[in-house]
A protein has these predicted regions:
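Extended, well-ordered alpha-helical scaffold/bundle regions in very large, multi-domain proteins
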Residues: 79, 84, 91-94, 98-117, ...
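Hydrophobic side chains in beta-strands
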Residues: 25-29, 40, 61, 72, ...
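Acidic glycine/proline-rich low-complexity segments
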Residues: 1-6
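Outer-membrane beta-barrel proteins
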Residues: 31-33, 61-65, 76, 89, ...
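Extended aliphatic helical segments
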Residues: 19, 40-41, 59, 75, ...
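Exposed, low-structure sequence patches enriched in small/polar residues
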Residues: 20, 106-251
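Beta-sheet entry/capping signal
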Residues: 24-26, 35-37, 67-70, 88, ...
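A conserved hydrophobic secondary-structure block that centers on an alpha-helix together
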Residues: 10, 14-90
Length: 251
């Protein structure tokens, strides 16, 4: 949720160049089971500048198999009459040495009053996002991943973070198998097989992607390599290329 390139660059979409920084402070504390962090920046907003004030805090508590955390980001741009607050609760659960689950729940609250600088654009939006990732490696050969995410229509963390888009749900899965136990008489040193698959759709259920891919590679004792790839994708919609003017079908 924190993307430091937002700082010192001015607000996106307003044609501003680099903005001077008046104040920057970073404090961190690493304890036996609890970590704390604070990050504060104030940009120059004199003479009609579009500088803003940024704050980010981080709290994380760790036990033997569970890590819980919270992050807050807050941005105020007085020239735009804009305030943006994003809160994130996150979790890492290590069920065993072979299995791990990670996840986040995010909430954004954006408030902007209309004024001449922001082209009389008023914003009052709140929304949620979340994702969860499960990984499992039962042995040295097999590795599995499953990933699910949901980003609400009005979720926005771009004031102090980065996201490609909102209004989508995504599913991704991957299974890989590595083999290194070829006999000495074999010309193969190792092989790897990876099956990946995924789908993305808008929150209204319009398909943005549906695909699968299978890769297999061999590494010879001579260090030569051979790889085969196969995959497929279904027809999909593109809801961004028209810039808000409907959906475009892509085969």
């Amino acid at each position: 949720a924190l993307y430091t390139r937002r700082i010192g660059a001015g607000p996106s979409g307003y044609g501003t160049s680099i903005v001077d920084i008046d104040l920057a402070t970073k404090l961190t504390y690493f304890g036996k089971s609890t970590d704390l962090g604070l990050f504060v920046v104030s940009e120059d907003s004199a003479n009609g500048g579009l500088g803003g004030d940024f704050l980010s805090s981080r709290v994380q508590h760790k036990t033997s198999d569970l890590t819980l955390g919270h992050r807050l980001t807050y941005v105020e741009r007085s020239a735009l009459d804009r305030e943006a607050t994003v809160q994130v609760a996150d979790m890492i659960w290590r069920k065993s040495e072979n299995m791990e689950m990670r996840g986040q729940i995010l909430h954004s609250d954006i408030s902007q009053l209309a004024n001449p600088i922001n082209a009389q654009t008023r914003v009052d939006s709140q929304d949620f996002a979340s994702w969860v990732n499960w990984s499992y490696a039962p042995n040295d050969s097999w590795y599995h991943i499953l990933y699910l995410s949901h980003y609400g229509d009005d979720f926005d963390m771009n004031d102090m973070g980065y996201m490609q888009r909102n209004d989508f749900r995504e599913f991704f899965g991957s299974t890989s198998y590595d083999r290194t136990d070829f006999p000495d008489s074999s010309s193969f040193l190792s092989s790897s097989t990876v099956l990946e698959y995924g789908s993305t759709e808008t929150t209204d259920g319009d398909r943005l992607s549906l695909w699968t891919e299978l890769d297999h590679s061999w590494t010879f004792r001579s260090t030569r390599q051979l790889a085969l790839e196969a995959g497929g994708a279904a027809a999909r919609w593109d809801d961004q290329i028209t810039r808000g003017n409907g959906m475009l079908a892509n085969s």
